[in-house]
Regions:
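P-loop NTPase nucleotide-binding/switch module
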Residues: 1-13, 138, 144-145, 214
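Conserved G1/Walker A P-loop phosphate-binding module
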Residues: 2-79, 83-90
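Conserved beta-strand elements of the Class I
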Residues: 16, 97, 230-232
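Conserved GTPase G-domain signal focused on the G5
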Residues: 24, 143-145, 159, 163, ...
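Short, flexible loop segments at the rims of nucleotide/cofactor-binding pockets, characterized by
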Residues: 42, 72-77, 104-106, 111-116, ...
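Conserved nucleotide-binding/hydrolysis micro-motifs of P-loop NTPases
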Residues: 45-46, 70-72, 101-105, 141-146, ...
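Conserved C-terminal guanine-recognition region of P-loop GTPase G domains, centered on the G4
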Residues: 56-61, 80-189, 219-223, 245-255
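C-terminal accessory "lid"/substrate-recognition subdomains
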Residues: 209-228, 232-255
């Protein structure tokens, strides 16, 4: 692999981070990259326009991390920010959708369907499925759940992380239902604490598994045509070429 600075942005893996305002998107980016890439604040709507940050993440290689505005931004400029987020989705190779795990556990306990409790996330999940964009659901803020579990441990003598695992399973099953006929789209669910830096290896492993098999492959026609396009190829002929011997342009055309 060449120097990171020599890799054109268009050839890098674009990883888009999506979620509600204050779900921990920017904190997750900083934790995964181990850099202060994004501004983190308790004020909702800190991230406005999408921020594109080129970097290298092992073992994914050269990437572009896209930090987006919350898709529930109801501020004065919120609608325009969400439009910019939709534009970022067009460039995304793998999406990471961040959810607050406490909200997930509460919805599961109350028996509220995912598509109702997380209407925006469900709509974006379906959007990515239709685009065949793999998705990683990151259930964030497990540190708060673990603190609660530690309090229970002191009284019961047992630390139980079952709520976190149950939340992951619930999101996976519910999201499969949301996708419907698009359920074959690849997605995974991980539990993390962006604040404490926990679960980052799980995020990177999920991204690695979801990396499209043909990503980074160079084709003779580049991105000029897609798989199902109808193309007319014109091959030059060389009457002086030996019988049965293909000249280079013919070889390239057949490839």
């Amino acid at each position: 692999m060449g120097n990171l600075n020599e890799t054109p942005s268009a050839n890098r893996l674009h990883i888009g981070i999506y979620g509600k305002t204050n779900s921990g998107k920017s904190s997750l980016i900083n934790a995964v990259t181990k850099q202060e890439v994004s501004i983190v604040a308790d004020v909702a709507g800190t991230t406005t326009d999408p921020v594109y940050k080129p970097m290298e993440i092992h073992p994914l290689g050269p990437c572009v991390i896209i930090d987006t505005a919350g898709f529930d931004d109801d501020s004065e400029l919120g609608e325009r920010r969400v439009e910019k987020t939709h534009l970022a989705a067009e460039k995304t190779d793998i999406a990471v959708v961040v959810l607050d795990i406490a909200e997930v556990i509460a919805a599961k306990k109350a028996g509220v369907p995912f598509k109702k409790a997380f209407k925006d996330e469900a709509e974006w999940s379906l959007l990515f499925a239709k685009k065949h964009t793999p998705v990683v659901f990151a259930l964030n803020k497990i540190d708060e759940i673990l603190l609660s579990a530690e309090a229970q441990e002191k009284s019961s003598g047992k630390l139980d992380n079952a709520a976190i695992e149950a939340a992951k399973c619930w999101v996976y099953e519910e999201n499969s239902a949301v996708m419907g006929k698009n359920a074959d789209n690849s997605f995974e669910v991980v539990a993390v604490s962006a604040l404490k830096g926990k679960g980052m290896d799980a995020v990177i492993s999920a991204l690695t598994r979801l990396l499209p098999e043909d990503f980074g492959q160079e084709f003779i026609l580049g991105d000029l045509v897609s798989q199902t396009d109808l193309v007319l190829l014109v091959m030059p002929q060389d009457i002086q070429a030996p019988k049965g011997r293909l000249i280079l342009p013919q070889v390239q055309t057949l490839r």
